[in-house]
Amino acid sequence: ITQAKVRVRRLPEAESFFGVFFPSWEQGSEAVREIVQNELPVSMLRLSNPLETETTLILSGKSWVRLADRGLRMIGYGDTRCLMIFGITGSTRLFKRTQREAAALCRKYGGLFVGTVVGHTWEKSRFLAPYLRNTLWDSGIALDTLEAALPWAQVRAASGAIPQAIVEAMSKHNEQVLAFAHLSHVYRDGASIYTTYLFRRTAEPDELLRRWHEMKHQASLTLQKYGGTISHQHGVGTDHALYLPAEKGALGMDALHAVCKSFDPDGMMNPGKLF
C-alpha cells in the first residue's frame, strides 16, 4: 500500500465527557437504552457494572476518590452503583441541548450527574489500560477480554451471567477470577457487552491455555443461551469459529461458504477463520 485516502472533518466547537452514577445496573441500563432510543446525539456512551465501576475508581489513583466514595454512599449510591460516561461533540447549540436532555433522562432513572471530572479522567487515561496487560503478566496475572452483542431484552441478564460463567469455570480449580463488564456500543435494539477478566497464571503454559479455554468456552455457551452474537467487533476467528454454526444456522453457514467461494475461490484470503 503506497497511498491512502482519509476522511477529515472540522474540529468541533464543543466536546466534553460527563459522568453519571446510578444506584443500580438496572437503572443505568434503562437510562442508556432510553438515550439511544430517543436518538440523542451523544458521541460516546458507556455504562460500567458495579465491579467495573469500583475497579475504575480504584485504578484512577486520585485522592478525591475516597472522599467521593464516602459521599456517594451517604446519599444511597453504594455497592451496586454503576458509572456511566457519555460524550457530546459538535456545535455549541447541539452540545447544550444534548447535555440538558441527557441529564434529564439520567435523573429519571436515579442518575447523579457529576459533571466532567470523571469523564475527563477517563478521556486522559482511556488508551493506557491496554498497556497494563504486560505489567500484569510480569506480575503473574493474565488478562483477557471478550465481547458480544444482544437485544435489549437479554442485555440485563446476560451482562451478569457471562462474567459469572467465567468465575465459575475456575472455581473447581479453587482459583478466583476478577470479571466485570460494561456496555459499550449501544443501539436502538440492543447493545454490546464487553467483558474483562483477570486470573492467576499457572506455572505450566499448557495448563494456563487449558484454563483459558475453559473460561472462554463457558462464556461462549452462556452467550449462546441468551441469543447473542458470538462477536460484535473483534471478529470470529479461530477462537469463535466453533460457535458460529449455532448462531447462523445451516442456511446462514451455506451463505457464508458461498460468499467466500465467490470472492476467494482459491482460499487465499485468511482461510480457516470462519470455518
Walk through the language-model features, giving the residues of each.
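Small/polar glycine-rich anion-binding or flexible loop at a beta-alpha turn
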Residues: 49-51, 186, 229-242
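General beta-strand structural signal in soluble alpha/beta enzymes
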Residues: 2, 43-47, 115-116, 232, ...
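Activity-critical C-terminal alpha-helical subdomain
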Residues: 236-275
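Short, conserved aromatic-histidine micro-motifs
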Residues: 13-31, 215-220, 253-267
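Shared catalytic-loop signature of beta/alpha-barrel
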Residues: 203, 208-210, 215, 222, ...
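C-terminal substrate-recognition/cap domain of FAD-linked oxidoreductases
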Residues: 8-10, 21-22, 29-218, 226
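FAD-binding core of FAD-dependent oxidoreductases
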Residues: 1-12, 230-236
